Structures are given as structure tokens and as C-alpha cells.
Amino acid sequence: MTILVAIDDSANAHSVVGVARRIATLFGTSVEGVHVQEDGSGQRAAAIADAANVPLRVRHGDVVSALRSEVKERDATALVIGTRVQREGPLPAGHVTLDLVSSLNRPIVVVPPHAADRPLRSVLVAVEGDGESHALSALYERLGNRPVPEVIVLHIVEPSELPPFSDSPVLEAEAFEREFMIRASHSVSADPSLIRFEMRVGDAPSLVCKAAHELDADLVVMAWHRSLSAGHGRLVRAMLSGTPVPIALVPIDADAH
């Protein structure tokens, strides 16, 4: 398995490479770099790769096409990329990032500008209301028998999805949350005591961004169908534009590696 990291000449490149190396350490794999040269670029990227002891390949042409080809040729298990500094407007993460996350059937880790340079101690996983989570399953499958960081399972409940509580609303709410915890942990055959569960009620896009900050997560993991126009797309857009935490987007139809 290889983690492929896209290295450019931007100020964010140090953070991107750092995140890629920490993810590779977490999953017990190696890191290889790629730089798509434009107008003679690449000196800074080469220096960053050399300082991090990451082998670097230089490619030419369209950035998106070159990165897609590199992922396929190296059979990379995941791609780590950075976003632009100004994340505003209809394309908050930049067209290159959005094209890649929508088209590649591999996990992609998106590193925002000024991501904290620190170990991956806490991973926040957004899960579905039924407790099933492709993202949570993928995380545990890739970890195997390696040490597990703190895993925080976050479930956002829309107010309309709450069951009607009768005479004992507090007790019934606790039972509702406990049942969800059991379903989520059983879906990955994990000991519930080793997973931290958090539940929020309200609008998912804003609450996931807020929870990532409040819970001091080092990485957010989300599964989605690679469509920005529906379903998880609204949540993914909000995360790409609203959180300083690296985000691992796991396609539900991802290739197994």
C-alpha cells in the first residue's frame, strides 16, 4: 500500500506532506509524492519532499488528469491533497480538489490551509442514523491490528428524525443513544468502550464542522457517494469550506486496497 501525496509550491505544502506522513504511519504504509509541473514550478516542492524524505515524481500536463493517472499507475491506496488558501465562493476548495474528490474511487484526504502540525491522536467519524458506516468500517479495516487512536463516532440527528418520547423523555433519549452506540460498534466488531460516542441534534453541515473544533479532532472521516449536488454533498461542501481539520473522504464505491 502507498499513500500518494500531491506536493505543489504553495505555503500549504509542508502541512500536506506532514499529514500524509502521519496517516501513513497510522496505517503502516509508505508515502510517495507527485508534483505536476506548471511554468517551471517544482523547486519548492522538491525541497519539501527531500526534507521529508519522500520520493517525488514530476509530471506534466493537466493537474487533475496527471494526478488521476499517478494514482492508477502507482495503485495508491489513498491520495492526500491540499486546498487553496482562499476558500470562498461556489468552489470553496478549488476546482482541482473538487474534480478529484468527485471522480476518484479511492479515499482522498483534503488538507486545509494552516492545518495543525500535530500527531493523529483523535479521529472523528461521521456515521449514518442506523449506526452503519462505510467510513467507520474502512477505518478499522485499514488499521488492522495496529494501535488505534481515539475514535469519536458522531451522529447528527435532524429534529424530525427523533422518535417521539413519552412519559420519561430523558430516559428514552438515553436509551435511543445507547441503542445507536451498540449498532455502530457491532457494525465494525469493536468494543464499545474503546469508541467515544457523540450525538448532536440539528443541521448536519454546521454541527459536524462545530463538533470537529469542539472535540479537538485531528482528522475527520466521512463516507459519501462522490456527488456534491445531493445527499452527503451538502455536508462535504460545508466541511471543505468551514473546518481547519484535514478531511478523509471515503467513496462508498471505493476500490479495495
Predicted regions and their residues:
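Glycine-rich, Arg-bearing micro-motifs that act as flexible, cationic patches
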Residues: 9, 81-102, 119-122, 221-242, ...
